[in-house]
Amino acid sequence: MNEKEISEIRRRFRADKSNITHVRGCYVNEKQEIVSQFDQPLSLLPQEECENMLSVLRRTLSGTLGKNLIEMPFTTAQVVDSDEHRLLMALRDSKLTDEEAVRMFFEKVIASYRPEGTYLILLANDTYDVPYRAKDGETLEDASENIYNYVLCTVCPVKQTKPVLGYDVPENTFHNRDIDWLVSAPQLGFLFPSFTDRSADIYSAMYYCRSASESYDEFIDAVFNREAPMPAEEQKTTFGTILGDALNDACSLDVVQTVHSRLCGMIEEHKASKDPEPLTITGRTMKTMLTACGVPGEKAEKFEKACAEQFGADAALSPRNLVETKKFEIETPEVQIRVDPEYSEWIETRYIDGAPYILIPAGAGVQVNGVPIAITRPDVEYEETVSYTHLRAHETCADL
């Protein structure tokens, strides 16, 4: 699925567009015990409650593709004959009326997902009469292309509110509000089957994870019977480790600045192009980039090999998972420097009197703990000048 296809399905989760007639739910306590189950017809809910329910479900299709939303492919063997795929198909084809399939699914989730508190499992089914889309991108609502029948699973933490004072308008008094339980934003979930090329793709599901650092291996193994993908935060850390280890003494500030700048540039260009397909790079792409930065060929090849070992041969990585476009940091055990990436090239490293320094150009507006300071040349008192702030790794911490 690409971003346009995800957005198209997200728009379904509104009261005036959805064909969701009911939502199945299972409330689980901190002991992994089922407290209650329900089958809630949306038509019987007040409009505001119906919209809130759809809003919770819709958030399972939010976030960044490749970071929070990840394709989960099924093998041909799984589609032909496997318990996990058969169960998902039973949920979809029965429109959540197969009681045995719903029970088995709830039990599978409970056995594989063990958060600290209580949580809610929601299942919804929708049938989407996909409108025809012309080559110029215009959608013809009265011309159906196919029927997309799918299920959406959402797992939400349920948190207890704290006792607070509330104002009673009719009585014009303040009272303690009772402790209540509130459904939080989805923690994980999935869409099955995927909406690929604007039609059902039973060879794939779209998995959602709110946290870029969590993987929920047991849940993924139980529901999809496959190895969990490396979380986005772990990808970033692994990428940095590979870069430093493979390049070794060739991993200079200039090289890292250039890699960061080029990856950010690729992200910006992709965003400007409005290409719905996700932006990806491979270890081979990075090898070419490193060579262009002046990295010796053998070290660039070592990097490519390490990428294949850690991420998989010819793995397609999202640049958004490898760099932070709005932050550039330099750290030592005692120093942390944060710079707007637009000005990262202002920073340089240099040896002065045999000691390594990090140099930052310091013009007007320099502050220390909120106090504006003057930087003067040693031989010129009170002279206004543009100088350099020298940071020895064990002496100073500066933020830009």
Residue ranges with predicted function:
Residues 327, 353-357, 397:
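A generic structural signal for beta-strand entry/edge sites
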Residues 322-344, 348-349:
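C-terminal accessory/binding modules appended to enzymatic or scaffolding proteins
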Residues 366-382:
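Extended Gly/Ser/Thr-rich low-complexity repeat segments
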Residues 389-396:
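Conserved small/polar residues in nucleotide/adenosyl-binding loops
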Residues 2-46:
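Charged, amphipathic alpha-helical stretches
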Residues 29-324:
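Long, hydrophobic alpha/beta structural blocks
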Residues 356-364, 369-370:
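Extended, charge-rich low-complexity regions and/or helical-solenoid scaffolds
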Residues 113-115, 322, 349-357:
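Short, ordered beta-strand-loop transition motifs
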